[in-house]
């Protein structure tokens, strides 16, 4: 990709798609927690002056290639498309964590409380788009429901972050 050979349609003369899938499977098999972006950046540094595209453009193409391959891989394993898309939309930080998150999200979707939770989440996101910086000013909360929601947030914020740091994604989602 760095030298201008970007796979497209049926064109992939160097098997980059197959190689990307192989890398994904190796990471999953061995449980490697190496950030993909670090590997890409190391590769870019090693290529130096041989690059024909800007490093940021190369990173974008490589991440897109891995995202497409990983999406196909997870789809072949039978995970719901929306769960895959949801998790991949957060980025390709850790190949292993992505699969764990897709599993956790897929399990959450099976719960009877998921649909009302998803509706409430969409509403909150819609409201937050109108906000300035994403910070909550407790002095602006007047309605009892607003105050209660903020109390619940304060109560759950740290435990959820701790579960995420421990890679306990299912427990983070259950909170």
Where do the PLM segments sit?
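Amphipathic alpha-helical "coupling" segments that flank catalytic cores
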Residues: 1-175
């Amino acid at each position: 990709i760095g030298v201008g050979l970007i796979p497209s349609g049926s064109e992939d003369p160097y098997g980059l798609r197959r190689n990307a899938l192989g890398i994904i499977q190796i990471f999953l098999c061995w449980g490697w927690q190496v950030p993909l972006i670090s590997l890409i950046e190391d590769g870019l540094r090693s290529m130096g002056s041989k690059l024909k595209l800007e490093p940021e453009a190369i990173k974008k193409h490589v991440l897109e290639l891995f995202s497409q391959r990983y999406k196909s891989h997870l789809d072949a394993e039978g995970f719901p498309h929306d769960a895959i898309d949801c998790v991949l939309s957060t980025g390709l930080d850790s190949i292993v964590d992505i699969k764990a998150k897709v599993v956790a999200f897929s399990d959450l979707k099976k719960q009877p409380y998921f649909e009302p939770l998803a509706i409430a989440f969409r509403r909150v996101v819609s409201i937050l788009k109108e906000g300035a910086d994403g910070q909550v000013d407790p002095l602006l909360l007047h309605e009892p429901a607003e105050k209660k929601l903020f109390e619940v947030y304060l109560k759950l914020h740290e435990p959820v972050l701790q579960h995420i740091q421990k890679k306990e994604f299912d427990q983070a989602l259950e909170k």
